[in-house]
């Protein structure tokens, strides 16, 4: 999934620093959906003029939430990481999304 996302972002001329953050968010959100979600997982990456949006949907109606992971905890850091690296994020239950500002050079 990360390799496909990175190739797509490269084709869309997303700046490398932003692309790296987007790929990290893709990994965290898809993993979260696989581990905590239900049914099919769908990833959408939308590249606009100055923003990249990542959306992951599954069939779990419970929204993703920020959790405090203990120092020895093996989980609970994914959404906190997305919160730290993205410019905005939210979860409505079946969909969790995040956005990254990207001032790409004109083609």
Model region roles, listed by residue range:
Residues 2-3, 83:
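Generic alpha-helical structural signal
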Residues 34-107:
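Conserved beta-strand-loop-beta-strand hairpin that lines the nucleotide-binding pocket
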Residues 3-27:
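Conserved short strand/loop->alpha-helix "switch" segment adjacent to the catalytic nucleotide/phosphoryl-transfer site
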